[in-house]
Amino acid sequence: MAPKKDKKPKKSTWKFNLDLTHAVEDGIFDSGNFEQFLREKVKVNGKTGNLGNVVHIERFKNKIIVVSEKQFSKRYLKYLTKKYLKKNNLRDWLRVVASDKETYELRYFQISQDEDESESED
């Protein structure tokens, strides 16, 4: 028999990006305030404000990067982003869209001008 090798669990990290470029450039979204919101609201082991060395939240200009050493769901990040938008009354204008596997992006809702004009004529 071949000797068994010790299997060490891989230390994996989860990394997600939030692209806030459009909303920040238009001046309706404060990325610093949102970063602080995430630091206060992200739960680790069922407790908020317990980031420690497990979850790192960084801001580079108009992007926020969340790196976690413990399992962290991309869906949870979307949930917190939507919660922040609702709290600041931005939910009616902005939506959270996945642009790729590790990135969310804030985009404006597309409202067609043709529908508004036809309704006002009636």
From Swiss-Prot:
PANTHER family on file: 60S RIBOSOMAL PROTEIN L22, RIBOSOMAL PROTEIN EL22-LIKE
InterPro entries, A to Z: Ribosomal_eL22, Ribosomal_eL22_sf
Record has Phosphoprotein as a keyword: yes
Any GO BP annotation: cytoplasmic translation
Phosphoserine modification, residue list: S112, S118, S120
Disulfide bonds: none
One Pfam family here: Ribosomal_L22e
Gene: RPL22L1
Gene source species: Bos taurus (Bovine)
Similarity comment: family membership: Belongs to the eukaryotic ribosomal protein eL22 family.
Protein's name in the database: Ribosomal protein eL22-like
Highest taxon of the lineage: Eukaryota
GO (cellular component) term, any one: ribosome
GO molecular function, one term: RNA binding
Keywords: Phosphoprotein, Ribonucleoprotein, Ribosomal protein
Record's keyword annotation contains Ribonucleoprotein: yes
